[in-house]
Each structure stands twice: as C-alpha cells, then as structure tokens.
A protein has these predicted regions:
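Transmembrane beta-strand segments that form the barrel wall of outer-membrane beta-barrel proteins
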Residues: 1, 25-30, 54-60, 83-88, ...
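Extended lipid/amphipathic-ligand handling interfaces
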Residues: 1, 10-18, 39-47, 68-76, ...
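A generic tandem-repeat structural signature
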Residues: 7-10, 15, 19-39, 44, ...
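A generic beta-sheet turn/junction motif
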Residues: 18-20, 33, 47-49, 62, ...
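Single conserved hydrophobic/aromatic residue that forms the stacking wall/gate
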Residues: 147-158
Length: 158
C-alpha cells in the first residue's frame, strides 16, 4: 500500500474498507515514512486521519532511537507518535522506560506522561512528567522528578 511518495506500508495480509478508508494489515507489517520505520504484526491505518496504530506490540525506529511498546500509534503527517504499556526507548547513550510516552520523529523529543526512568552510564532520572530531547540529552522535568548522578571513579595516585 502506498500513500503519496513518502509512505509505504507492507504486510502479509490486507483488508481495506473503502467506506471507512481503514486498512487492516496483519503479519510482518512494515510502515515506512522517510527515515522512520514501524514494525508490527497488527496495524490499522486510517487514511482519513493519516494515522497508523498497533495493539499487539510494535517497534518504531528512526535515525536516533528505537521505541517498543505493547500499543502505539504514529502519524506520518505530524511525525507524532504515542506509546502505551511497557514502553522502551533505546538510544546509544541511554535507555528510557515508561508506561506512557509521546515522541516526535522530527525533533526527537520524548514527552514523559507517566512514571518513567532514564538510565545512562552515570545517571538515573525518574520523572512522572516532562520533556526529554534525545539528541541534546536536555530535559525539562515537572511534577515528581528525581535525578541521581554517579561520580566517575578516578584512579588512586601511586
């Protein structure tokens, strides 16, 4: 299935309802929008709202991050995505885990919407609401947030 020249959706099985303009793709589903790829086994794509959503686990990948969750949605038009249940964002510099997270594949900003942990080699951040720029590693933490920074160890002088 193709939408314009930037969105391609593949799957082993496709059911399309012309009245509702909803495509249901099953097994080995791949949705590609420029540098963003969504992989799942069950995807519904609403052509009217330009929104794809999965509900049996999925993975969204861009140049910087890999996000997985039980349920999620992605809009190629707005580059916005929403993830729920067992959310994990893996970046070469850190891992963010959460129950609910929004993410923009264009500006690479994760919006924390529930209890979340961001863990890197020397830091552990807990927050229940805030913003985290995955490219600059700058955060704006709101509500209940805790930061633990480990001091790097230095060798003892001889």
């Amino acid at each position: 299935m193709e939408q314009g020249d930037t969105l391609f959706i593949y799957g082993d099985y496709l059911y399309y309802d012309g009245m509702t303009q909803i495509a249901q793709l099953r097994e080995n589903v791949k949705m590609i929008n420029r540098n963003t790829t969504l992989l799942t086994d069950s995807l519904n794509y609403d052509r009217l709202y330009d929104l794809g959503y999965y509900f049996e686990g999925g993975t969204l990948m861009d140049e910087e991050n890999v996000l997985t969750s039980d349920w999620g949605e992605y809009s190629p038009a707005t580059k916005q995505s929403v993830f729920n249940h067992d959310v994990k964002l893996v970046n070469p510099k850190f891992v963010l885990t959460s129950d609910t997270l929004r993410y923009n594949t264009e500006n690479k900003i994760a919006v924390i919407l529930g209890p979340s942990n961001i863990v890197s080699d020397n830091n552990h951040i807990y927050s229940e609401r805030g913003f985290y720029n995955t490219m600059t590693e700058q955060a704006e933490l709101l509500d209940l947030s805790l930061i633990h920074i480990s001091e790097p160890t230095r060798p003892e002088p001889i």
